[in-house]
């Protein structure tokens, strides 16, 4: 579609629906579409996306274009995305979303449930609420099930799980993916070196990481891992050198 048609489509379906559509694409494909929108139009669409999805798209754009889009955004959302962009895309920090629920330990159970109800539509998941102190250091985690089953007069600090599975923001994204799978979790908190809660990574965020990791393992087993260049540009000698070991083994 032409740039004008894309802008018209975004206007007709609404920024939120258009953002959902972009989130389903490969980030590189979504970035190509965003590039054909004006900075203001791109800002509106990216604001409607989940922060982690928006960052995946922005990281594929030219830095000058990213700065222009961020200028057009609401200051709070722009700062959120700038912070996420400060982490390399292959790290846990680059994969996390800041849309999580955090509670102070002295909040009562009934108050916590009311708070969760208010923010449910804005956060990534409400299955877990993270308990932090006044300096945002991670103290524990409480599940929605635990909140519902606990007496309303008890505090979150009394019922929270203190042994929290967490990952550093600088850790490789595959470490976060493995933690989610091995521990059977729906989300894992991301913290800095001082244990301050920065964001969360949910299981759907790492599904593509796990798929890619398994694909690479299977390709390696079959000797068919991708080449460093397109087949159309590979010389016969290069192809022979890459495959001869496996061919000899198969013979």
Language model region names:
Residues 1-226:
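Hydrophobic packing positions in regular secondary-structure scaffolds
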Residues 226, 230-251:
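Core alpha-helical transmembrane segments of integral membrane proteins
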């Amino acid at each position: 579609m032409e740039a004008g048609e894309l802008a018209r489509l975004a206007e007709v379906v609404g920024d939120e629906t258009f953002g959902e559509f972009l989130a389903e694409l490969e980030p590189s494909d979504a970035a190509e579409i965003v590039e054909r929108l004006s900075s203001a139009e791109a800002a509106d669409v990216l604001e409607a996306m989940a922060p982690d999805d928006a960052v995946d798209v922005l990281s594929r754009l030219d830095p000058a274009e990213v700065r222009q889009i961020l200028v057009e955004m609401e200051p709070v959302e722009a700062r959120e995305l700038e912070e996420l962009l400060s982490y390399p895309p292959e790290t846990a920090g680059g994969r996390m979303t800041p849309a999580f629920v955090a509670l102070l330990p002295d909040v009562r159970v009934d108050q916590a449930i009311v708070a969760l109800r208010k923010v449910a539509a804005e956060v990534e998941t409400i299955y877990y609420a993270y308990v932090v102190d006044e300096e945002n250091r991670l103290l524990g985690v409480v599940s929605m099930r635990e909140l519902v089953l606990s007496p309303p007069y008890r505090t979150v600090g009394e019922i929270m799980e203190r042994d929290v599975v967490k990952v550093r923001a600088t850790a490789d994204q595959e470490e976060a993916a493995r933690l989610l799978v091995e521990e059977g979790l729906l989300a894992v908190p991301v913290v800095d070196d001082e244990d301050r809660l920065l964001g969360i990574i949910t299981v759907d965020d790492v599904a593509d990481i796990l798929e890619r990791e398994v694909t690479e393992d299977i390709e390696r087993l079959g000797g068919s891992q991708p080449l460093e260049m397109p087949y159309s540009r590979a010389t016969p000698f290069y192809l022979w050198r890459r495959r001869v070991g496996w061919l000899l083994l198969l013979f």
